[in-house]
Amino acid sequence: TSPVAIVVVAIVVQLALELLERHAYYGIYFGFGIYLASLGYSRDQLGIIQSLFLFFSYLIPVVSGTFADRYGFKKVLIAAYLAYIPAILLLLATKSFSGIAAAMLCIGFAAGIFKPLIAGTVRLTTDSTNATLGFGIFYAIVNVGASFGPIVAGKLRAISWDYAFMSSAVAVSVMFVITLLFYKEPPRSATVEPLGKKLRDILTTLSDVKFASFLVLLGLFA
């Protein structure tokens, strides 16, 4: 197999994973407020779940990126799927507020684990001659997935909410198979920032009242 073919396969795998994950994530998130209202829950309850959901999904990447650098991207990708799939299945199985909240927190946690990994893979598999193109394609795929997911979920939830959630579970399951069979571990730097320092950075971020308030407000009004 030629080096060019290897690179092309790696890029296709990375983009497929990102497209499927954005489909799974936004397919659930964009319709979640409608779903919760259909079950009779209030906007205040929606705000609580969304605040915690965004809190996890935007802070966990700091830690998951460090784990990927230290233990390998493929292992952390699989960990994300193992958090994602049971959470979506729980969302299918429960109608209680506590159950739905737990499912969404786990989905936010899983999305946070996944979030930096494909961007990190693109960074490690490109160089100064093609990095701009690589990231341009990457973010185009992010936008396609973010648009495609809600459209598909919207069509499916017109039949049943279960079908909409199942489409996300299927997408993550396909990601699992693609990762096991085709994902190639990118070369990693020999110098890895200590996990303890990353955790201290998170605590420093959380101590910023303005930033924490922003996350809460984002959840309430998203």
Where are these regions (language model features)?
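Central cavity-lining transmembrane alpha-helices of secondary-active solute carriers
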Residues: 51-64
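Symmetry-related core transmembrane helices of the 12-TM Major Facilitator Superfamily/SLC fold
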Residues: 163-181
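Flexible cytoplasmic inter-helical loops of multi-pass small-molecule transporters
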Residues: 183-201
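Helix-loop junctions at membrane interfaces in 12-TM secondary transporters
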Residues: 92-104
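Intracellular juxtamembrane helix-capping segments at the cytosolic ends
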Residues: 113-126
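Helix-loop boundary and gating motifs at the non-cytosolic
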Residues: 5-54, 222
